[in-house]
Every structure is written in C-alpha cells, then in structure tokens.
C-alpha cells in the first residue's frame, strides 16, 4: 500500500525500471528486500544497476551506526563528483571542495595541521589527478586513514604535471585490482567491445549489425566529414533513435582548432540546431541565445556549478544584462560581464569531456588532427558514450589513432620513489622530495 501511495499509478513501471528505488524512497524497505524484488524481476546479479545499489548499500553500512567508519568521496571535476554521488547515494565532492580551497591564498585550508575527518578516502577518476593536487590530498589525509584510488589508467593522463595513477600502478608498491571482465549485458554492446579492441591496439568492428550502438560514417575530406556530422546530429540520430540532438548528443573533438575542431563545429551546430534570433548576446567571442547548450568552464562554488557542467540557456534579460542557464533543472543567473565562464557546448574536446558521460557521442576523425591522434585519446572519447557512439571521418585517421599507443612518458620520479620505499630504501617520499 505504501508503494502505491508513494508512486501512484506509475508504481509498477517505476519499480520495474529500478526496484532499488524502494530502499531509497520507502521507509522500512532496505537493500535486501529491494534486491529480492530485483531478482524476481529477472535482473541479473552482475547487472550494473545492482552493482551500484550494492555499492551504495555497502558504503552506507560502513558509515552507519555501530561501524564508525567515516567515508569521504571525491573526484577531480564537478561532473565526476556528481556521478559519484549518483552512483553511491553518498555525497561526492570535488577535491578542491574537500580540501577547502582558499581563493585568497591559492592553497587549501585542509592539510597536515588541519587534516580531513575520514577513515577511508575514495578518489574517483584518479587518472585526472596531477602530482601537485595529489600531494595536497595526501598531506590532508589523517594518520591511519585508508586511500582508495579508482580510475582507468588507459585514459588520458592529467592536464597538469605527472601521471600519478600510472606511476602508482607501475611501481608495484601498493595493492592493485584490475577490473577486466566484460559482463554479459556489456558484452552485447559494441561500444564496450570496440573500446576494448581500441585499447588493445586493434581496429574496432566497423560493420553495424541490427541494434548496434556503434557506427562509423566514412568521409574522405574534412569538409565532407563536417557535412556528414551535421546530418548525423541534426537528422539521422533523432529520426532513428528518437533522441534530442541538443540535450542527448555530444560532439567530442580531438582538437579545439581546425575545420573539425570544437570551436568551428560549435558555430556550425548552433546554426543548424538553434539559429541565433533577435534575442541574443555576444560576449567573449561567442553568440549566446535562448536554447543554446553551454558549458561552465570554471569551478564556481558560490553558484554551485563546476568546470564541465552542461546547461541550457533559458532566458536573456537585456534590461538587466543577465542570462539564465538551467543546469539539470536548476536556474543559475550570469551577468553579461561574467559570460567568460561559459562557452557553447554542442561540441567540446575529448580532454574537456574526461570524467563525464553522455547518452550519445559523435567523434570527428581526420588526419588534420594527426598531432593529437592517439589511442588513449580515442579510447577516452569512445568510453564517454552510454547509449550510442558514432565516428565520422577518415578510416586512415582512425587507424592512426589506434596504432599510436606510445603515450609520451612523463617524468616525475614518483614511480622510482615508490619502488625505493617498497624495498626499504631511505629515499624520502614527501614534500621535501617533491
């Protein structure tokens, strides 16, 4: 009875879609009961929805009464922190927010003298963390606390110096668990299987059987690729899959510049999907209009929006010189002078998308991007797509990216210091050594 009072006429549909919502929404129903309902509905034990619910339950139990384990969850970007919250049901914060960044000093309030209050610190998307930020994080870790780093070492390394996650794994100084098994549902996805092929230096399967979620649209010249990309985004994906070309589709580019770069494609996609009308504002090299998809490009803790967050412009008030953006239903207002925090986001770079996921990803590939065509870049782009991935461009460019697995080595001495420490060396690992 409580179920129908909570969900109304949509109770059956909602529970069938996600039975684990029962544990979240209805008092007296826990994970185990919801899990029994899921089993009766035929949800497999290894289904991702069950994994997420189980993880949330496990963390909640660890932090619950009687266990006295304080768990802190963080990620390097706001978008990744939000995904962490959605996956676990616990609060995920950016590393900067966790460490209480001080804009006046450029440092952090949390450190050796004022450490974090946790027994277990979980860092997601750890491949994105550079040596300087990791140093600050470790200095703030209290004595006796455990650190769990979660990340995909095969993705792009951090924008800042070092390759912390790769060096930690390569040192053999700490326990490492590699998740390599592809479960049954995932094995049916061409996105997953082709991502694994790319990561192993093999060309992805480009033939698209019925029901495929991975496509390759060949185009010999960049101009042809740009035209085909616009057609795919504007017409083919909405008609065939019933998806919104603005809200559901994200174009990810290897580079920002060039005819197939993010900036040029943003302007072309804006013209195709949301042509500027009379109500517009031009600032910082962009034209903003109601209905445009935009990206926040800096962490703004006062507005509670973060680097990489996507939103839709809902209103422009010329009298007040203000623009309103909806971020997942939450309205945020910007003065015209603050619009340097926003860029059009129909297209963005793969680097900028790291740590995010999108329903549909479209990736242009051309030999003009030769300087950036690398296996880890392509792998990172492909793994951003949840329901559909479309590559548009030259087969030669795709092959160049797959073959180029020689990521530039970054020298930070972290691996050597860790190896020396694990052998009982007198090498000091800490602020002085760094």
Predicted feature residues:
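Conserved helicase motor core of P-loop NTPases
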Residues: 153-303, 314, 323, 421, ...
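Conserved helicase motor core of SF1/SF2 NTP-dependent helicases
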Residues: 78-82, 96, 100-106, 115, ...
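Residue-level recognition of short, solvent-exposed, well-ordered loop/turn junctions
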Residues: 142, 287-290, 306, 353
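Conserved motor-coupling elements within RecA-like helicase/translocase cores
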Residues: 84-89, 110-118, 288, 353
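Terminal-proximal interaction/regulatory segments of ATP-powered molecular machines
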Residues: 62-66, 70, 74, 302-313, ...
